């Protein structure tokens, strides 16, 4: 993660807030905790079909995890690690992000922000490495996403709103001026969208009692360019999906995430009882 939330190694104390493991390491931890479901974006799934070979690999991985302090000498995960992995597997709400990075050779970084009860966890996958980070709720969703993406100057543009399908068909500045933009802003939008350094697509999901999950059909977005950061937010109006683009301030990123979460059955990041208690 590139933001202010530092990752740490698991140890013997009670202040463990982060851990870095391989995908094989995560599978071993999940097996110890009898967990099998994880956010699709992270791609955490069994990768060695041959049982005898898997046992050999997992034995070595378990030894490495024990040396790292992630597993104790009885083979059980550190309590803080177990809590983070449980949150990842059984989250009440999840934001799932795919981050395409032209600025570092076109790699895709996958990340999630998960909430289970009061506990919030960020997980980032880069290649075969996975970083889990426990984070305080007061950081806020925009702060948690920014912890992954890093900060950036917001693009100096006017807001742009339109029907999502129609905006998607715009390929030049002249078409964008139909939405009330000045020619200068329309050209700037065109330059940003056609030549991004990186872009992020974020969807949300909600876990229901009984274990079923609902995913949003639309996504929020973050786009970084030489001209600064843009955020995009989806909004359902009268059965029509609209998209809005705004300068990429943290406040506007929070607006985008709130708008995305409104598309879930609950309409929010918190359960109603939690929101009422906080209010």
From Swiss-Prot:
Protein location: Cytoplasm
Record bears the keyword Cytoplasm: yes
Major localisation: cytoplasm
Source organism superkingdom: Bacteria
Family statement drawn from the similarity comment of this UniProt entry: Belongs to the EspG family.
Protein known as: ESX-1 secretion-associated protein EspG1
InterPro entries in the cross-refs: EspG (IPR025734)
GO cellular component: cytoplasm
Record keywords: Chaperone, Cytoplasm
TM regions (residue ranges): none
Function description: Specific chaperone for cognate PE/PPE proteins. Plays an important role in preventing aggregation of PE/PPE dimers.
Subunit structure: Interacts specifically with ESX-1-dependent PE/PPE proteins.
């Amino acid at each position: 993660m590139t933001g202010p939330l530092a990752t740490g190694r698991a140890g013997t104390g009670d202040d463990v807030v982060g851990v870095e493991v391989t995908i094989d390491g995560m599978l071993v931890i999940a097996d110890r905790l009898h967990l099998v479901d994880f956010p699709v974006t992270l791609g955490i799934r069994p990768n060695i079909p041959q049982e005898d070979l898997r046992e050999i690999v997992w034995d070595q991985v378990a030894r490495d995890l024990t040396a790292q302090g992630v597993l104790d000498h009885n083979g059980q995960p550190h309590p803080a690690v177990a809590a983070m992995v449980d949150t990842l597997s059984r989250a009440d709400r999840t934001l799932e992000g795919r981050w395409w990075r032209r600025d570092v050779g076109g790699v895709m970084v996958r990340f999630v922000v998960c909430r289970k009860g009061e506990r919030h966890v960020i997980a980032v996958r880069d290649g075969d490495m996975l970083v889990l980070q426990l984070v305080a709720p007061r950081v806020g969703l925009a702060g948690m996403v920014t912890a992954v993406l890093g900060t950036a100057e917001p693009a100096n543009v006017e807001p742009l709103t339109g029907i999502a399908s129609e905006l998607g068909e715009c390929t030049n500045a002249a078409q964008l001026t139909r939405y009330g933009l000045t020619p200068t802003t329309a050209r700037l939008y065109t330059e940003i969208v056609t030549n991004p350094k990186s872009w992020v697509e974020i969807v949300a999901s909600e876990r229901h009692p009984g274990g079923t999950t609902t995913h949003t059909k639309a996504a929020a977005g973050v786009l970084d360019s030489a001209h600064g950061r843009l955020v995009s937010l989806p909004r359902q109006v009268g059965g029509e999906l609209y998209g809005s683009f705004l300068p990429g301030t943290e406040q506007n990123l929070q607006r985008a995430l709130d708008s995305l979460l409104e598309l879930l059955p609950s309409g929010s990041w918190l359960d109603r009882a939690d929101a009422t208690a906080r209010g």
